Amino acid sequence: MTKFTTEEVRSKFITYFKTNNHTHVPASSLIPQNDPSLMFVNSGMVQFKNVFTGQEKRPYNKAVTSQKSLRAGGKHNDLENVGYTARHHTFFEMLGNFSFGDYFKEQAIYYAWNLLTKKFELPKNKLYVTIYHTDDEAASYWKKIAGFGDDRIIRIKTNDNFWSMGDTGPCGPCSEIFYDHGENIYGGLPGTKDEDGDRFIEILNMVFMQYEQVDKDTRIELPQKSIDTGMGLERMTAILQHVNNNYDIDLFQKIIDYTENIVKVKVKGEAKFSYRVIADHLRASSFLIADGVIPSNEGRGYVLRRIMRRSMRHAHMLGSKEPLMYKLLPKLVDLMGNIYPELKRSESFISNILEQEEIRFKTTLERGLKLLSEETETLTKGDKLSGEIAFKLYDTYGFPLDLTKDILKNYDISVDHQGFKEQMLAQKERARKSWLGSGEYKTNQLWFDIKEQYGSTEFLGYTLNEAECKIIVLIKDNNLVNNIQETDTQFLLISNQTPFYGESGGQMGDNGTIFAKDSEVEVIDTLKYLGSIIVHKCILKKGKIHVGENANFSIDVKYRQNLRIHHSATHILHAVLHEVLGKHVTQKGSLVAPTYLRFDISYSKAVTNEEITLIEDKVNEIIRANHEVNTTLMATEDAVKQGAMALFGEKYDSEVRVVKMGNNSLELCGGTHVRRLGDIGCFKITNESAIAAGIRRIEAVCGEFVIKLMREKENLLKSVESSLKTNKNELITKVNNILERNKGLEKELEKVHLAHLDLSIDQINKEAEEIKGVKLIYQYIENLNNKVLRQAAENLTKKVEDLIVVYIVGNSDKLSITVAVSKAITDKFNAVNIAKELSLFLGGTGGGGQASLAQAGGHDIGKLNKIHEKLYSLLTVL
């Protein structure tokens, strides 16, 4: 049996099916598109789900893929097992061949058998197959093609060998191929009590989609029968490299060897498992980030964080004091970047996210491990850690439950899952009660009732600025009313149709006016509820307004135009960010206001001044080109095929609105836009900042607001010139001279303060108070910088061997504490401990420093009169 590399196995599989007229389809993102039932793509068939159900047509009827997949929980895939067993992974590659109404059972079995025995040269006597117990057709084909007898064809009655997409829809029997690793490895054949052992390993699974489940009692033959085949790349490679553990294949070994060279710990004993965890989780983390997932505390982001923090804990176990994962990324890119180019494109971004997350977690990891160690001191083998402590580790120290379980597994200690769930539910209940008490619950139910009775609001604003509409709902103080007649009353109004845009997609809602027969209403905002109810937030200016009457709805055209300008600019900005910062940049949020725009992106470092200038230049160049802006309604599938930008994880209707701006931007968008890009006028970035880990925010203005901004800056410059009695050509020189002079004055002032605080040995002996055999100098000072205090306190403790100096400085409503201790007595009196106790007494959170010099903070000025008493009791105890 020839030995193949991982890359050769993948390539040979794809080439084999391409030779047999299958279209090679690239791997889809790990984030399922328009499939809310899945968090991640977990098999090769996911991207073809709509093809199998007949909802989508492709230009081919046979396909082959190498699909990146991810599983981080569920049956046989608990995260805590990854790295400790031979075949558990979070990230893996699923090789697959598919038929959509072309070949079926016999040809699928032939392809699989020929691939394994001819192309991969597996010995026939090492192979067994399973079929669904009633699938005589599959049994006959296995006998015909492989020459197997009944002893090698195992009939399985359970659902393991019958696949379905859900309660209804396509379904069918399966046939699996198993490889025998030999008698020296524990395990039994499928269907036996020892089937979970490692001897007989499933290497290929074929699903014969031949039925449609109409309801729970009715199953009919499908007119178009299909094939879904999956083969795990890592499992197959292990067999072809003559090893029984997936982590021993070349791909993982190269990552492990690379890691070993960095951490300098031998791959043996318990360390071996940590190396495997890191290798597996490096792949999962890197591919998730490449596909737009950012570590967070919910949804996909939390799964990523769980995986990353588990790997970081294992890096910690190997003695890695510095961030490790990002240092391993170049090796992964070298190994997998050619087949998955998104890794290469996003390498810098992935590296930054990995490093930042590890730095952040290291600050709480040590404290969390300390708490866990303290809480398990009295626990022995077989005991349970309380759910309360597990939840505290999760809530306070950022330990996912998987991580706590993973740590305790080494000591045969489990976690009280029920107690953890109760703590989690209690927290949610507290939040729920807060929500119920806020009045939001009642309002929420109201919108559901309105939608059920009246349906959606028709939006007319793409083409009309005013229209006659019928008032169908009036709401005041969360209650339905028939009329509003008190002037200056605030209320909500819903009509059957409206030209007013309800806030959504980042664009703020419209303002304007409503005129009815006897009334005038000011619309101060427009909202959107449940995705399709447009709600006008109103103030009655005069008259009386009734449910059922018609009225003239007129938007503020100038306000809308400014919204259009800034919204269209966000699309151009998005396209340019891809060009300047990289394709891996994804939109994380936006706000389109009439006076500015805000755009949040996944990007792990500050955008440089040079990049900001380049972005501005490119956006303005596109604006000046004055391309036409076109909007089209089309099927979501067609829009995505044309390259329209869509947000990852968003669920879109079957028909979407596509906004095209020349050849520069194509996005799915329901907002309002300019007719030509020249209408934007000009574009200027006003601010760039970090708002969360891996998320940057860009703020900008357009059109007349750029001119306003420039005028404000020009007026400010003139004001500064006037105050400093200079001109703009000499302004920088003048300011630098002033700064230099101020620096000199500050140094002189520091010297004066130090001289004032300095004491001779005789003065120290005279002024110091003696407590428990040591001298204490305590002083409260107003408005003095900490640098001077540190130096002054340290100078005094160097003069006398038994001195403690405590300075407290009041600056506004904050207190700064400086504690210095003569080095000769630090074994008994520790400056850090004294500073910490004083800080806690004054409402602070503790301090830091060294045994001889420490600083801390506080804010409870009312306790200053008791500080001397606190110091006395503290030093007496010490």
Curated annotation (Swiss-Prot):
Gene3D superfamilies: 2.40.30.130, 3.10.310.40, 3.30.54.20, 6.10.250.550, Bira Bifunctional Protein, Domain 2, Threonyl-trna Synthetase, Chain A, domain 2. Zn(2+) binds at residues 567, 571, 669, 673. InterPro entries: aa-tRNA-synth_II/BPL/LPL, Ala-tRNA-lgiase_IIc, Ala-tRNA-ligase_IIc_anticod-bd, Ala-tRNA-synth_IIc_core, Ala-tRNA-synth_IIc_N, Ala-tRNA_ligase, Ala_tRNA_ligase_euk/bac, DHHA1_dom. GO terms for cellular component: cytosol. Its cofactor is Zn(2+). Its EC number is 6.1.1.7. GO terms for molecular function: alanine-tRNA ligase activity; aminoacyl-tRNA deacylase activity; ATP binding; tRNA binding; zinc ion binding. It is found in: Cytoplasm. CDD domains: AlaRS_core. Keywords: Aminoacyl-tRNA synthetase, ATP-binding, Cytoplasm, Ligase, Metal-binding, Nucleotide-binding, Protein biosynthesis, RNA-binding, tRNA-binding, Zinc. It comes from the Bacteria. Pfam families: DHHA1, tRNA-synt_2c, tRNA_SAD. It is an enzyme of class 6 (ligase). One of its GO terms (biological process) is negative regulation of DNA-templated transcription. Transmembrane segments: none annotated. Consists of three domains; the N-terminal catalytic domain, the editing domain and the C-terminal C-Ala domain. The editing domain removes incorrectly charged amino acids, while the C-Ala domain, along with tRNA(Ala), serves as a bridge to cooperatively bring together the editing and aminoacylation centers thus stimulating deacylation of misacylated tRNAs. HAMAP family: Ala_tRNA_synth_B. Belongs to the class-II aminoacyl-tRNA synthetase family. Catalyzes the attachment of alanine to tRNA(Ala) in a two-step reaction: alanine is first activated by ATP to form Ala-AMP and then transferred to the acceptor end of tRNA(Ala). Also edits incorrectly charged Ser-tRNA(Ala) and Gly-tRNA(Ala) via its editing domain. This is Alanine--tRNA ligase. The gene is alaS.
